[in-house]
Design a protein with these regions (language model features):
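Residues that form or immediately flank small-molecule/cofactor binding pockets and catalytic motifs
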Residues: 3, 8, 93, 137, ...
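Generic recognition of short, well-ordered alpha-helical segments
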Residues: 10-13, 39-42, 53, 83, ...
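Short, contiguous clusters of charged residues that form electrostatic/catalytic patches at enzyme active sites
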Residues: 23, 53-56, 110, 114, ...
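Generic anion/oxyanion-binding catalytic loop in active/binding sites
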Residues: 17, 29, 36, 44, ...
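C-terminal substrate-binding subdomain of Rossmann-fold SDR/epimerase-dehydratase oxidoreductases
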Residues: 155-274
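NAD(P)-dependent short-chain dehydrogenase/reductase
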Residues: 82-91, 104, 114-171, 176-187, ...
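N-terminal Rossmann-like NAD(P)+-binding domain of SDR-like oxidoreductases, especially those catalyzing
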Residues: 1-133
Length: 274
């Protein structure tokens, strides 16, 4: 279902056995938004609408069924990170280009957070906001502009690995299983303020690409490009709040996570053959 369109859950045949109109929903996780880098150029309007109309629709469902609501926001709401590379806490506010090619996503997520807190105050909704930092793992879409799946695909095929940025470009990587456990912990809590979900370990993209080459036993070489206008230097999260209030922190190492993602890609290669 398109989240930007309203829906009557009781009219869906697949949900009739759940008796939604009687039992309702207890929890709503809103993860519905284009997030791959190339989507910013391909679906700019849909991205902005998902972060506005789509969020309103899902909040109305939470209001109707008195469900606890969790919005998955993004590290992009922090805008330009501190120049000294210091990890950002939830109260950090950086400059953000609200008219740039990523505005439908970056500024859209800021507006989505505003909608959530406004509904919370106006209708006493039970809400929470997770600011997700870079996440990776198996089943990620190929050719989406995301670095890890692109690295793995090219490494397996022994093709050149193209890095968006230079040799010093850094990013943090949180394995999907860890991120999901963070969301579940947040939903089970009574926290309503935004909270960072991500890894504190910053790695250069060069380091990650070399790890992928080693894991896949590839002969790929590296190159660097700045052609992606929709990319920006991301912030590094301070997750002390998640550690203290959710007892959550990432457990899967980057080597273990990359190995899992690479193994999945290789095991499903036959599905992508023409």
């Amino acid at each position: 279902h398109d989240i930007t369109e309203d829906i009557e859950f009781g009219d869906l045949p697949g949900l009739k056995k759940f008796k939604v109109e009687v039992q309702g929903f207890q929890e709503i996780y809103n993860l519905a938004c284009p997030t791959a880098p190339k989507d910013y150029a391909k679906f700019p309007v849909k991205t902005a609408v998902a972060n506005s109309v789509g969020v309103v629709n899902s909040l109305e469902w939470a209001k109707k069924y008195k469900a606890r609501y969790l919005l998955t926001s993004t590290s992009a709401v922090y805008g330009k990170p501190p120049e000294n590379g210091e990890p950002v806490k939830e109260n950090y506010y950086g400059l953000l280009d609200f008219l740039g090619p990523r505005a439908g996503y970056n500024e859209g997520k800021r507006f989505a957070e505003t909608l959530v807190t406004t509904y919370q105050d106006a209708y006493q909704l039970n809400t929470s906001i997770a600011r997700i930092f870079s996440t990776y793992g198996p089943r990620m879409l190929q050719h989406s502009g995301r670095q890890v799946p692109d690295f793995i695909r090219n490494a397996v095929d022994n093709k050149e690995i193209e890095i968006a940025g230079d040799e010093q470009s850094v990013l943090t990587f949180c394995y999907v299983k860890d991120a999901v456990e963070g969301l579940i912990a947040l939903m089970a809590s009574e926290i309503s303020d935004p909270i960072n979900i991500g890894s504190e370990q910053a790695l250069t993209m060069t380091e990650v690409a070399k790890k992928v080459i080693e894991i896949t036993n590839s002969s790929s070489t590296l190159s660097y490009t700045n052609k992606y206008a929709y990319t920006m230097q991301p912030a590094i999260p301070d997750i002390s709040k998640a550690k203290e209030e959710l007892n959550w922190f990432p457990l899967v190492s980057i080597d273990e996570g990359l190995k899992s993602a690479a193994e999945f890609y290789k095991s499903t290669a036959f599905l992508r053959r023409p």
